[in-house]
Structure formats: structure tokens, C-alpha cells
């Protein structure tokens, strides 16, 4: 998997970083950015992942924007890849350095393996169900804090209802630091290694969260529903 992500990064993603023309940046579904690099990277990832498991299904963020029915693959009795070719597209399109490739392998909604790859740093974060979380093949365990004033977290409020957004504002007055990278892959990694204690998220698209959820779980963290 490291070779696949490295090659896609070197051949497709990084050549476009800070080098996108205006016609290579567009919007899908009205407000979500998509770049030529997202589209081409997803095609290449799909081709390579289906070579690994030829009978598996594939759900990619860009493919979903054209065909929402592909989410039904999660209900089938088969393996399924879930991919976000560039998590943090807004950062990528604006020349900011926090973006990642996110991949997960599931079977009937059970997450089996996941990978989060940081192209600029050439760092692979991965997880195997019941076996642990790893950074460049070194096993890691998260650490927390019992002191609320030392807590650092992320809150994404873009898609919350206005009333719930107001309730979340209280966290900014309690914790040491609350911010967002605008790249959930980076935030999951930070939680896994203990640099961040929590993330409160509002948009739960599978490609944004399935890879990171397994990484955090296997590092010793947890995920819960607030509402």
C-alpha cells in the first residue's frame, strides 16, 4: 500500500500542488471543492486497489459525487475499498500543506484495515483491526490527559444546526486549544499519537472517517455519537 500511495502522490498529487490552473479547480454539489488531482488520483487508486482484490467493490469520494448508489456496496457480502484521494482538498487547492490520502478496507461494514498517507512527509499511518495502529510500521499507543485545561481538540461546526453550534462554543472557553486543520486525516493522526485529545465532527462521509476511526480505535482511543 505504501508503494501505491507513494506513486500516486509523486506522479499525480504533488506535481499539482501549488501548480493548479483555474480550470483544474471546480465545485461539486454546489460548495465542495474538487481538483483535477482529486479526480485523477482516485482513478489511479481504484485501478491499483482492484488489482489487489479483483472481486472487491470501490467507494470513492469523487465517484460518489456522480453516483450516490455506490454506498449500497457496504451492504453486500464482499470486500469494499473506501477512498478519499485528497483529504483536505481546500488546503491542497490553496497551497496549504495539510492534506492526505485516506483508504480503508471493509467487509459488510466491518473495518478491517486502514491507511492515511501524508504525501509531503512520506509518512504512512495504518491500522489493522485487533492488531494495532502504526506509523511507518512502528506500533503506537495514544495518550490522553486528565487535566481539562491541558486538553487540545478539534471542532468542525460547518454542518451543525445553529443551536448546536452555539452549545459547542463553550468548549473554546474550557480547553487549552480548540481549532481545525481542515483535514480530518491529520486530526485523526494527532489523536492517535496523543497530540490532540478529541475531535467533534459534523459531516460523517465514510471516506472522511472510516480510515481514521480504525486508526484511533487501534491506538487506544474511542468514537461516540453526540446526537
Task: Locate each region found by the language model.
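An extended, acidic
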Residues: 143-227
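Residue-level signal for inorganic ion chemistry
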Residues: 13, 38, 49, 89, ...
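Generic detector of well-ordered alpha-helical packing
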Residues: 39, 62, 85-88, 119, ...
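DPxDG-like acidic metal-binding loop motif
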Residues: 71-134
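N-terminal subdomain of lithium-sensitive/metallo-dependent phosphomonoesterases centered on the IMPase/IPPase/PAP
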Residues: 1-86
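Short loop/edge segments at beta-strand edges and connector loops
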Residues: 60-62, 137, 182
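A structural micro-motif at secondary-structure boundaries
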Residues: 135-141
